[in-house]
């Protein structure tokens, strides 16, 4: 007959037997938990873990240790797909928006050209000229021509350079009246050797003295001769 100590030892060494319950499940410990617990106990943590801690990406197949890391990685894929979709739709939208803008610019150019032709490119007889010829003629006629009406004839004179009394026949007639005034005027003109001017005017029409002078001068004005 065994003593009490031997009986306890035999009970510890006896394998544990589990009885099935009424619903067919086993009591604790479960087989999976016992298997992983024994692997951790004998393997020092080198065995498998339950539940599995590896999560793979369905797009690129990359594996992550946690579900949170996989979720962040999937967000990157979603943003990339949204960006590619937006880029694929953007060229069509710009192509659709470009023709109205071009039409508006063309309308503005057409209106501007019509206004130039109607307002600035008409001769007295009503005929039209080319825009380039009109621009050149307008610049020359408005800035570099001098009209003198003498005995019903129109004379064109362009004087750009040194302005002196010798270039103006009206002043020359006044100066020729007295030699002293001529010398004084000549001395006064010598004080202003360099003078750039543009004179546009009408001298005499039908015996009436009418003058319209538009002068563009560079330098000081010469003294007037009385």
From Swiss-Prot:
Q: Where in the cell is it found?
A: Nucleus
Q: Where do the ZnF regions (C2H2-type) fall? A: 55-77
Extent of Polar residues compositional bias: 85-97
Q: Which SUPFAM superfamilies does its entry note?
A: beta-beta-alpha zinc fingers (SSF57667)
Q: Would you kindly state one Gene Ontology biological process term found in this protein's UniProt entry?
A: regulation of DNA-templated transcription
The protein's name is: Probable transcriptional regulator RABBIT EARS
Q: What is its main location?
A: nucleus
Its GO CC terms are: nucleus
Report the source organism. Answer: Arabidopsis thaliana
Q: Where is this motif: EAR-like (transcriptional repression)?
A: 212-216
Q: Which UniProt keywords apply?
A: Developmental protein, Differentiation, Flowering, Metal-binding, Nucleus, Repressor, Transcription, Transcription regulation, Zinc, Zinc-finger
Single GO term (MF): DNA-binding transcription factor activity
Q: Write out the domain note.
A: Contains a slightly degenerated ERF-associated amphiphilic repression (EAR) motif, which may be involved in the activity of transcriptional repression.
Give the source's domain of life in one word.
Eukaryota
- Give the UniProt tissue specificity note: Strongly expressed in inflorescences and flowers, and weakly in siliques, seedlings and roots. In flowers, it is expressed in petal primordia and their precursor cells. Also expressed in the lateral root caps and the basal cells of lateral roots.
Q: Which gene encodes it?
A: RBE
Instruction: Tell me, in a sentence or two, what this protein's role is.
Output: Probable transcriptional regulator essential for petal development. Required for the early development of the organ primordia of the second whorl. Acts downstream of AP1 and PTL.
Give the Pfam families listed for this entry: zf-C2H2_6 (PF13912)
The ranges of region (Disordered) come to: 80-102
